[in-house]
Structure formats: C-alpha cells, structure tokens
C-alpha cells in the first residue's frame, strides 16, 4: 500500500533549497575552521525542525518477524564495533590473564565456552541503551542528519513504539543478567542510561558527556569480565585496570564526534570540536591516544610484541587524527579507534614471561 503526501512544488523546492544551503554552508565552514562554531538559537531551531512535507512515496511494509529482527539490528549495528566487539574482547582476554582474576590457571576452552554469554550480555545492554537513546526528540533530529538509516528516521519505528519496546526490553535485560552474571553492572548501566538520555547528560558540555560515557564503559568492561570469569572474582589489579579503561575513554572518546559535527551542531551539542574548534580538538584527542599506547604496555609489563602492537596502532591513529582530516577520513579513524581499544584490551595476554 502506498501513501502520497503532496505540497506545492514551488514551496517545497524553496524550503529544501534553503535547508540544503544552510547545511552546506555549515559543512563547508567547518572543514577549515579553527574557532568554535557558534549557532544562534534561531539557526538551531530551524535545522532541528522536521523535514517539510514534500512529494514522496512512503511504502508501508508488512511487519513480519524478519522486519522486526532487522529493525533491532538497525538499532544496534552502529555500536557493535565500538562496544560489543571491544568489550567482549576485554572480558575474554582479561579472564585468560592470571593477574586479573582469582583463577591462577585459566583454561582456554573453559573461558571460550563463555564467549556466547559475554556477547549476549553486551548486546542486550547495548540494545537497552540504544533504544533509550534513539527514541528521544533530540536524537531523532541528529539521526536525520548523521544516521538517517536508523529505524525511527526511516519510519520503521515511531517514538511510541520505541518507548513500548524499551518497556519490554528492560526486564528482559535485568533477568538475563541475573542468569548470565554481571547484574550489578547492568543495574549501574541502567542508571547511567537514564542520566545520559532522560536527564540530558548527552547534551551537556563534552566533559560531562565523556565522564558518563567513561563510567558506562567501565561497567561494560567489569560486566564482561565477571561473565567471562564465571565463579572467580576480580583482583585489585583488575579494578585498577578498570579505572585506567575509564580514563582512556574519558580522554579519547571525543574521537567519535569528529565525523558527526554537522548533526551535533544542529542538535546543539557542546562537543570538543564545536567548543574548541577542529584543530585544537584533534590535539586533545591524539596526544592522550599516544600516551595510553605507551602507558598501558608499561602497566602490564608487556613483551616487545605488546609494546609494538600498542604503539604502532596508537601512533598511526594519532597521526591520522592530526593529518588525515575530513568526514570520510574521520569515519575511518573512528573505526581504527575501536581496533585500538581492542589492542589495549589484549595486552594482559602479551606480558613478559
């Protein structure tokens, strides 16, 4: 079944041309800007308004089981590389390290048998956060610019359906964590999700946003390790390592804001690139990345292999951030950031014998 929504063509073209010109000007200005971007409340409001009605064909798809599964996939797919994969690696690698749990002789087969549990725990918690985040009006405005393929901008899901989905997912995630392990971390993530989304921490200045994100990543890491370790508990060094992970995230997560600056400006977010300007923001990200690339191997008394992997990947990432600029390059650097965190998470297995 198809529904046709029509407006006067002249009005539509004029408004679309104005919108395209505004966003095009913002994008062009940012490419070479070194000063913070300042948008007036009027400009933010204009860019935040939904797209004007225009002549489009909206196809109503039959909502089969595959349709719903694909919708769930689209909700979470962007965080698979940044959270699910790295945090799963954190849990497995840390559980295999003799210094991070009370298991003095972890068996590879035993730990790997818990891999599906670790993946499921991370995925469920990411699903909960993503639904809570993407249902909010500000997130929808941003996603129309940065991620138009997400379910709500695409029309696969509306705000009311997303809220009801969240109501159903909440108890599922809680009881699943009672079975899988990591229930304390799951409850902590629920609180942080509420702070980040409903209390607006995501829209505060980037320092506050990064702090909440850092605590969230610490919870993901701790939960992953608890699930992977089974009946064994964490050692004092493991808790210190979790603090280091939080500091890494706090000081480098602004990397994700570099390719999203246009959508963040429309939303009115105070990210590092928008507050300090592009050039300064890049140095505030690249320098900590290189520092952690050297510090983390030292923390674990890593072998030559550990130092080499960490310094080479981290050094190349820092170089890319400083010298390979532009949205396309920044998207590649963001993916490399995810790989870099996985390299750091693997360092407990690269210690000197």
Name each model feature, range by range:
Residues 2-353:
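Multi-pass alpha-helical membrane architecture of UbiA-family
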């Amino acid at each position: 079944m198809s529904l046709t929504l029509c407006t006067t063509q002249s009005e539509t073209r004029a408004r679309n041309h104005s919108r395209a010109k505004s966003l095009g000007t913002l994008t062009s200005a940012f490419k070479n800007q070194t000063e913070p971007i300042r948008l007036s409340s009027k400009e933010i409001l204009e860019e935040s308004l939904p797209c004007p009605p225009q002549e489009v064909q909206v196809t109503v798809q039959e909502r089969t089981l595959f349709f719903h599964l694909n919708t769930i996939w689209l909700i979470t797919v962007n965080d698979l590389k940044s959270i699910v994969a790295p945090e799963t690696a954190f849990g497995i690698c840390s559980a295999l390290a003799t210094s991070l749990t009370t298991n003095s002789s972890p068996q590879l087969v035993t730990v790997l048998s818990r891999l599906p549990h670790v993946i499921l725990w991370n995925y469920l918690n990411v699903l909960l956060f993503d639904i809570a985040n993407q249902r909010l009006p500000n997130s929808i405005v941003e996603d129309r610019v940065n991620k138009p393929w997400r379910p709500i901008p695409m029309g696969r899901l509306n705000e009311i359906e997303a809220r009801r989905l969240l109501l159903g997912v909440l108890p599922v995630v809680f009881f699943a964590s009672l079975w899988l392990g990591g229930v304390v971390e799951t409850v902590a993530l629920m609180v942080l999700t509420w702070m980040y989304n409903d209390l607006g921490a995501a829209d505060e200045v980037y320092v506050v946003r990064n702090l909440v994100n850092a605590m969230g990543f610490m919870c993901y890491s701790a939960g992953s390790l608890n699930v992977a370790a089974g009946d064994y508990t964490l050692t004092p060094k493991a808790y210190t390592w979790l603090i280091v992970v939080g500091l890494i995230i706090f000081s480098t997560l602004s990397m994700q804001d570099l390719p999203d600056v246009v959508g963040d400006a429309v939303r009115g977010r105070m990210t590092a690139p928008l507050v300090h300007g592009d050039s300064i923001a890049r140095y505030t990200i690249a320098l900590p990345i290189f520092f952690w690339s050297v510090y983390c191997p030292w923390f674990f008394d890593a072998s030559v292999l550990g130092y080499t992997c960490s310094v080479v990947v981290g050094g190349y990432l820092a170089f890319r951030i400083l010298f390979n600029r532009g949205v396309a390059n920044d998207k590649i650097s963001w993916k490399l950031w995810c790989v870099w965190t996985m390299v750091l998470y693997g360092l407990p297995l690269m210690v000197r014998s």
